[in-house]
Amino acid sequence: MQSITIRRPDDWHLHLRDGAMLEGVIADTSRTFARAIIMPNLVPPVVTSADAKAYRERILKALPDSHRFQPLMTLYLTEHTSPDDVEEGKNSGLITAVKLYPAGATTNSHGGVRDMEKAMPVLERMAKIGLPLCVHGEVTTPEVDIFDREAVFIDTVLDPLRQRLPELKVTMEHVTTSDGVDYIKAARGNLAGSITTHHLIINRNAILVGGIRPHYYCLPVAKRENHRLALRAAAVSGDPRFFLGTDSAPHVDPLKECACGCAGIYTSVNTMSCLAHVFEQEGALERLEAFVSLNGPAWYGLQPNEERITLSRQAEPVVFPARIETGAGPVTVFDPMFPLHWQVVQQA
């Protein structure tokens, strides 16, 4: 197959940041993607509908005039989140989901939830009104090994929550383990999972072998090869419970290349080329559209995009920038460590 035309894709987990960084990165997403769920872990975080409305306005202001893009806003769940504010945000069409960050799990998550019981009133309201909960599925207790955080979260937090509120719709974001894949597959309704581009490509060796490579460090951290293969199998299967959420997370290089570097990989520039490569490798190009364009909208109760994009296989490797320059500073672009031959040749 030398070309493929699919419905315009969506990104169901994206970090756009704010200010100069927002202005520097948004076009890399909006050029190709029609919609994206926008993460709320700013400083300060997006905790109220008023915060979300103001942030949405800043995103739209930064959008290039020729781009058609819809930011889907989320709220950062805290132990003090107002159920009424959440419901009003949902009813107004402003809020697509609420995001659960266990305190300390990732970038700017120190204000997240420490005691799930204190968040139950808003979770109960969300279950009642049908508003999805997006979860960063890791525990942060110091006695749990970082590579086991996801599996322990499923057993100690997610499964008890779903048993208590079976009607709550939960997206397990950036699944990184076979444990997560198996748990989603075994669930009966109201559970789905997003998978990132980079977790389909790298395992933990990318971070550690041959020296510390900070631009492959993310949270959840990449796992063993058997987990990567389980993610690939899920992504290319066509199973409607799995869809793309890039978790593309820009940080300026000085904050990555230091003694205590930030977690996050910036994949927005070359995600579709990387994914076409992965699906071609797996003999599943015909299921790429389901993963990037169909399964996510179906899960979130939205219609798939009518616009199309075309990817073409080039004879010579496609050259992407090694880094982009933003007003906040340089940001390194994800290097999949293999040549990319697929290129988006016709945008929507």
Curated annotation (Swiss-Prot):
Annotated pathway: Pyrimidine metabolism; UMP biosynthesis via de novo pathway; (S)-dihydroorotate from bicarbonate: step 3/3
Cofactor: Zn(2+)
Active site: D247
Cofactor note: Binds 2 Zn(2+) ions per subunit.
Residues engaged in binding Zn(2+) 2: K99, H136, H174
Modification N6-carboxylysine occurs at: K99
Residues the record lists as binding Zn(2+) 1: H13, H15, K99, D247
Recorded GO CC terms: cytosol
InterPro entries: Amidohydro-rel, DHOdimr, Dihydroorotase_CS, Metal_Hydrolase
Residues bound to substrate: H15, L16, R17, N41, H136, L219, H251, A263
Reactions accelerated catalytically: (S)-dihydroorotate + H2O = N-carbamoyl-L-aspartate + H(+)
E.C. numbers: 3.5.2.3
Uppermost EC category: hydrolase
UniProt keyword annotations, A-Z: Hydrolase, Metal-binding, Pyrimidine biosynthesis, Zinc
Family named by the database record: Belongs to the metallo-dependent hydrolases superfamily. DHOase family. Class II DHOase subfamily.
Complex and partners: Homodimer.
Its biological purpose: Catalyzes the reversible cyclization of carbamoyl aspartate to dihydroorotate.
Listed PANTHER family: DIHYDROOROTASE
Protein name according to UniProt: Dihydroorotase
Organism: Rhizobium johnstonii (strain DSM 114642 / LMG 32736 / 3841) (Rhizobium leguminosarum bv. viciae)
Lineage: Bacteria, Pseudomonadati, Pseudomonadota, Alphaproteobacteria, Hyphomicrobiales
Gene: pyrC
